[in-house]
From Swiss-Prot:
Source species: Bacillus mycoides (strain KBAB4) (Bacillus weihenstephanensis)
InterPro entries in UniProt: RNA_pol_sigma_r3/r4-like, UPF0122, UPF0122_fam_protein, WH-like_DNA-bd_sf
Family: Belongs to the UPF0122 family.
Protein name: UPF0122 protein BcerKBAB4_3669
Superkingdom: Bacteria
Job description of the protein: Might take part in the signal recognition particle (SRP) pathway. This is inferred from the conservation of its genetic proximity to ftsY/ffh. May be a regulatory protein.
Length: 110
């Protein structure tokens, strides 16, 4: 569950500008502010089921955006490559060719 929440938070950060105001509000309250479906429903004067349906549709939309734009995947790969580069730089014997390959891989992501 925590893994899904973390993924949704990342996807929301990357793609929130593509959502409607209502979708942004529901997702923000549910994932960032940790409100329950009932609390959100009460705040917007709608049913709990309406909030649930909206959040599920929005989650599916965020996954579709990620499938097409792969911003999260590129971000995670960039983080992995930067961590590897830092590790290589901290080692006593630098492997120049390997560092060049890591830098080239980072450049290709952009």
């Amino acid at each position: 569950m925590l893994e899904k929440t973390t993924r949704m938070n990342y996807l929301f950060d990357f793609y929130q500008s593509l959502l409607t105001q209502k979708q942004r509000s529901y997702m923000s309250l549910y994932y960032l502010d940790d409100l329950s479906l009932g609390e959100i429903a009460e705040e917007f004067d709608v049913s709990r089921q309406a909030v649930y349906d909206n959040i599920k549709r929005t989650e599916a939309m965020l996954e579709e955006y990620e499938d097409k734009l792969v911003l999260l995947q590129k971000f995670q790969e960039r983080q992995r490559l930067v961590a590897k580069l830092k590790q290589l730089l901290s080692e006593e014997e630098h492997v120049n060719e390997e560092m060049k390959q890591v830098v080239e891989a980072i450049e290709k992501l952009d």
